[in-house]
């Protein structure tokens, strides 16, 4: 069989000048799907008749198409996957579980105000990310943007900070799964950790398509459950549940103690709210593996507003109306910890339903664990392609899995078994996990702030070098000022966390608690200074900033004519729908 039996379709990659996108097709059948790749086709083996085991083991071999840095991520995510990743991706333990400690620390009014503020900030961040992701749909996404548009040293610091955030989250989420099961039984937590770790490993072994399908299913369940809870909570508040002897509740609970622990309590909720929204930016990473980012990413970005408005703000307002922040069962108030969502249902004396929602919480935690593994592995691989991590982490197999990076992340998941060390009466696991959280605690603020700053630098350089916004496939309606506001919000949140870390709620300043709250900032600064000394990188001027390499431009006028070819009311409705969805 000769090369004449194959058609090679090579297209310029989205980010590298010498980075063709290669699809190899044999006459009569497809040998390889399109991949994000650069460089040359290497080590091609002619397709043969193979059984399942042969195909399975061959899939772990180096990718058929590789580039100099070894990346060959496949575009296997569809618009359907992107929609659910954006809507349900961050509906997880941060909302269902973490919000309990926020109510205990700051009270319902602080929670509602802070989540609205962080939600507004996230809208600015995600629209900026959407614009960049369409222009440069690359592996590494926003970490790559920070390296290119801000400073290589800062990109290095943010990338490692972001990776560590998701790297340490895997065992933490597995532990949350085990704790959540204690609602029903006191079975050894190691058993539950083993089960869920095995599930996550299997999902990731099947590659990005499996990740997309699993997230689609789990996110659908989370969305349905949250909408169902909102409807039920309204009925409970209005006194429509026969088993709830409290009758009409209205605002009687929230009026009792809207704020807890004063200004300190208010500031403390910032970090909890940020943790809840953590993961929203994953759509930027997924842009490198979606078939048509020009159509899929903008739609996913627009869905973020509705998710924030409905799933976060509305549900937390209803929690504030139904659950007292002084309840000792609330997470953060005592030894017996229950999700505020489950607690709201329990208070209405509805039998069976608390168990159903607790199961939904477990599903959401599995979803978050799956997403953290996906994100950490892709981030580590992206860093390796930029020479910010050892090169072997860029290894990608034939089905598009960043195999070595993925294995390292999954192996760290076994760290969750440290919970078993507490059986002898010690609290070693609490201490270890507190410091693991400290390593990653502020990562989201650095990442989101960097996205905004990257967008600002990109826009300024884009204008300086004579480009028009009409060349872009998607333009953030918030503009450059939206990114300025988003960056300011992130700086404000970092200041608030510094204040809370230094002046503890109910305690005096001490080094241990301060570094548990602010260690991530120290680590990011150390990464930045260390790389700056090593690489002696500098920030280029706007007129010299390279924005042309790999920039994907679009003829938006032709696309709009095709998309809105119909006239009349139908066209108006179509435009209105696309503006918000």
Swiss-Prot record:
Bilayer-crossing residues are 84-104, 109-129, 149-169, 187-207, 216-236, 266-286, 304-324, 348-368, 399-419, 432-452, 485-505, 514-534
The membrane-topology field of this record reads: Multi-pass membrane protein
Short name of any one Pfam family annotated for the protein:
AA_permease
Principal place where this protein is found? Answer: membrane
Alphabetically ordered keywords of this record? Amino-acid transport, Membrane, Transmembrane, Transmembrane helix, Transport
Extract the PROSITE patterns matched here: AMINO_ACID_PERMEASE_1 (PS00218)
Query: Which GO biological-process labels does this protein carry?
Result: amino acid transmembrane transport
Does the keyword section mention Membrane? yes
**Record InterPro entries:** AA-permease/SLC12A_dom, Amino_acid_permease_CS, APC_YAT
Q: Output the superkingdom of the source species.
A: Eukaryota
Q: GO CC terms for this protein?
A: membrane
Q: Where in the cell is it found?
A: Membrane
Gene Ontology MF annotations:
amino acid transmembrane transporter activity
Q: What family, per the record? A: Belongs to the amino acid-polyamine-organocation (APC) superfamily.
Task: Write down what this protein is called.
Answer: Uncharacterized amino-acid permease C359.01
Instruction: Identify the species of origin.
Output: Schizosaccharomyces pombe (strain 972 / ATCC 24843)
The taxonomy runs: Eukaryota, Fungi, Dikarya, Ascomycota, Taphrinomycotina
């Amino acid at each position: 069989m000769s090369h004449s039996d194959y058609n090679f379709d090579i297209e310029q990659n989205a980010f590298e000048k010498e980075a063709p996108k290669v699809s190899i097709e044999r006459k009569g059948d497809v040998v390889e799907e399109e991949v994000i790749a650069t460089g040359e086709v290497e080590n091609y083996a002619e397709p043969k008749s193979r059984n399942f085991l042969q195909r399975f083991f061959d899939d772990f071999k180096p990718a058929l198409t590789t580039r100099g840095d070894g990346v060959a991520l496949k575009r296997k995510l569809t618009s359907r996957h992107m929609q659910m990743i954006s809507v349900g991706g961050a509906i997880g333990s941060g909302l269902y579980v973490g919000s309990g400690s926020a109510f205990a620390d700051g009270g319902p009014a602080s929670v509602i105000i802070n989540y609205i503020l962080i939600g507004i900030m996230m809208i600015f961040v995600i629209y900026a990310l959407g614009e960049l992701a369409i222009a440069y749909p690359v592996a590494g996404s926003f970490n790559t943007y920070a390296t290119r548009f801000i400073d290589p040293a800062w990109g290095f610091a943010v990338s490692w900070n972001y990776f560590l955030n998701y790297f340490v989250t895997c065992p933490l989420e597995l532990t949350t799964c085990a704790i959540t099961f204690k609602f029903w039984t006191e079975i050894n937590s190691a058993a539950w950790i083993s089960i869920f770790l095995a599930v996550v490993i299997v999902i990731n072994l099947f590659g990005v398509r499996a990740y997309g399908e699993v997230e689609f299913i789990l996110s659908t369940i989370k969305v349905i459950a949250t909408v169902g809870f909102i409807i039920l909570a309204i009925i409970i508040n209005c006194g429509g549940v026969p088993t709830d002897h409290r009758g009409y509740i209205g605002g009687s609970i929230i009026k009792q103690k809207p704020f807890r622990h004063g200004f300190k309590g208010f500031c403390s909720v910032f970090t909890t709210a940020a943790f809840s929204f953590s993961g929203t930016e994953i759509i930027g990473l997924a842009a490198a593996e979606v078939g048509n980012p020009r159509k899929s990413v903008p739609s996913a970005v627009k869905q973020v507003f509705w998710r924030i408005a409905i799933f976060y703000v509305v549900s937390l307002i209803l929690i504030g109306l139904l659950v007292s922040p002084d309840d000792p069962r609330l997470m953060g108030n005592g030894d017996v910890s229950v999700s505020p969502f489950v607690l709201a249902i329990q208070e209405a004396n509805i039998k069976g339903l608390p168990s159903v929602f607790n199961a939904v919480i477990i599903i959401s935690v599995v979803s978050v664990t799956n997403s953290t593994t996906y994100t950490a592995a892709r981030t580590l691989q992206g860093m390796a392609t930029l020479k910010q991590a050892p090169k072997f982490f860029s290894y990608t197999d034939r089905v598009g899995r960043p195999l070595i990076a993925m294995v390292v992340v999954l192996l760290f998941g076994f760290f969750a078994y440290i919970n078993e060390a507490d059986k002898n009466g010690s609290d070693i696991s609490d201490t270890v996990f507190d410091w693991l959280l400290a390593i990653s605690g502020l990562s989201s603020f650095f990442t989101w702030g960097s996205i905004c700053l990257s967008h600002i630098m990109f826009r300024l350089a884009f204008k300086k070098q004579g480009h028009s916004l009409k060349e872009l496939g998607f333009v953030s309606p918030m503009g450059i000022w939206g990114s300025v506001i988003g960056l300011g919000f992130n700086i404000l949140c970092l200041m608030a966390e510094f204040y809370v870390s230094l002046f503890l709620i109910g305690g005096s300043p001490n080094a241990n608690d301060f570094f548990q709250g602010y260690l991530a900032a120290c680590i990011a600064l150390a990464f930045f200074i260390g790389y700056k000394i090593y690489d002696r990188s500098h920030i280029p001027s706007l007129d010299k900033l390279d924005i042309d390499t790999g920039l994907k431009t679009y003829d938006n006028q032709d696309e709009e004519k095709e998309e809105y070819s119909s006239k009349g009311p139908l066209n108006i409705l179509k435009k209105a729908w696309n503006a918000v969805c």
